[in-house]
Amino acid sequence: MFRMIQSLTPSLYDQDTFDTHFLRDMRKARYSIIIESPFIRLARIEQFLPVFKRLTSRDVRIIINTRRPDEHDTRYRTQAIIAIQLLQEIGVEILFTIKHHRKLAIIDREIIYEGSLNILSYYDSCEIMRRITSKAEAEMLIDFIKLNKFMEVK
């Protein structure tokens, strides 16, 4: 009759505090990480690459949804192509969505980060990211962004 409602535990981060918390959560991932970032910058990928390598070696599935490289500005297009190749070489799955502009991450179908910060291209701007721990919210978000079909067990 009564069901326990999982409480949301939100935290807010800015451009100076986001990476520390996000990297900590990623390192603890056991099953999967979804990152939606419309743009990809090579320097930013190089920051995350060691963590991604460790995760994929532990069979943590990483899915990145981004724009196609030809939708990047000319000066970033080549960077995006190189970065995507580096990611694919270590087993990261790349999805492309035309006109993509969402900025979010979902770790182990439970931890959500969402806000204004482009996770894979951030450089120098004023940003905000909210962290929420909720399996129900994560499942709703995965369904909403239509990534359930990519999250099936392989």
Residue ranges of model-derived segments:
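Acidic/glycine-enriched edge-of-secondary-structure segments
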Residues: 1-16, 34-40
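Conserved beta-strand termini and adjacent loop/short-helix elements that scaffold enzyme active sites
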Residues: 13, 65-67, 97-99
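A conditional alpha-helix N-cap/helix-loop micro-motif detector
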Residues: 14-15, 44-45, 94
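Short acidic active-site motifs
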Residues: 21
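Primarily the HKD phosphodiesterase
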Residues: 25-88
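HKD (HxKxxxxD) catalytic microenvironment of the phospholipase D
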Residues: 33, 92-138
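A short, polar/proline- and glycine-enriched secondary-structure boundary/capping micro-motif
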Residues: 46, 75-76, 123-127, 150-154
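Cysteine/selenocysteine-centered motifs that mediate thiol-based redox chemistry or coordinate metal-sulfur cofactors
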Residues: 139-154
